[in-house]
């Protein structure tokens, strides 16, 4: 993201840790903007970004392995404060002349450190519980460094070169298990990097509107509306920035929730006075998806067809150069980087055709889900719209496992409507992060009345989360679940069983496909 000159930035460099996004989250929660970049970022790009501080993340590699991730040692001469976490500390040690070796035993879990009072541990107790996750250890620190924390298992739990403002910690301050982790990160961000902490959604809107106007000029933009919160927020942000230069295309692909299409047209077309074209492409999508059961293939087909529909609609308009999408930061992260395996391709990331004729605008691709909701409120979108259930671009296409048919879509559509209605009636909308039904493609024997049935099973997925990167299954009252189950079985044709998904993320993702 292009940052305004006055915008404070903490740059997090990615070495493959599963906790990378948590570092970024923790810093943003302090009111300071933070971005995650690949460790191969050039010195020129770092200088252009002009960060107030740099954090080197943890990672699964060993620094002494031949193909281990590394950085340009010139980074330590930029005069910018640096904090190395776990692998980041070991890499700093190696590059600056210290020594690292494999530990006798891998240290994973809670540990106790003894810390000295310095800038990093300012105001914190000497003895602290921290979270360790490493199999290597520092055995000799570089010249100019001193120890600022130790533990029973290592003499070098934390180190510093005070004159150059370079720090390293062997533990993970970004995870909740580290007792004073947030305080340590805050000390680095506020005391060492001298950040004021003025980043807010109001500030983000000002910066993003200026960026959009500079990028677009007097040209036109198409916005892909899916009916979900993300694309809706993007549409309103763009409309605020460029007004009538924006045309929203709402593709009714037949994979929408019950009543979704009419709601979008009413709330945004009429409510926000936006130019929205509703395209009926149901037959087109169903034709392409016929016989397809692989989830990745379904996602890519849906992504491709979205773009081709836009191409068709854009050809009817003049001077359209840009396509706007509601891609989130979590979408980008989950689609994989050089240091992380792809979990699943995202419909806004992995499904784009190579011959796409539009330039992309993705104004919220640096925001997490809760930040997008905050942005929506700041933009004046009513709360009942901002707090609608997250809905993926592929829609119900990834909530029908296996091949998609009209009958299966109807089961998911009707069962999902019942689930949402009961959750709303029980006042649980704000307590549960996301909830929906899924058709797993399982049929089982049942008895309804005096007759044997062999019908579909509907799965209920309901999770609690803050940012969508991790989640836990929602502890919904059994009586509420029984009410939902009873209504689905009695009101939705060809369903004789309802199950509840009690898996967390990880190991599962929130969506089933």
Curated annotation (Swiss-Prot):
EC numbers: 6.3.5.2
Pathway participation: Purine metabolism; GMP biosynthesis; GMP from XMP (L-Gln route): step 1/1
Positions of ATP binding: 226-232
Key words, A-Z: ATP-binding, Glutamine amidotransferase, GMP biosynthesis, Ligase, Nucleotide-binding, Purine biosynthesis
Active-site annotation: 86, 172, 174
Glutamine amidotransferase type-1 domain: residues covered: 9-198
TM stretches of this protein: none
PANTHER family, per database record: GMP SYNTHASE [GLUTAMINE-HYDROLYZING], GMP SYNTHASE-RELATED
Protein name: GMP synthase [glutamine-hydrolyzing]
Organism: Staphylococcus saprophyticus subsp. saprophyticus (strain ATCC 15305 / DSM 20229 / NCIMB 8711 / NCTC 7292 / S-41)
Lineage of the organism: Bacteria, Bacillati, Bacillota, Bacilli, Bacillales
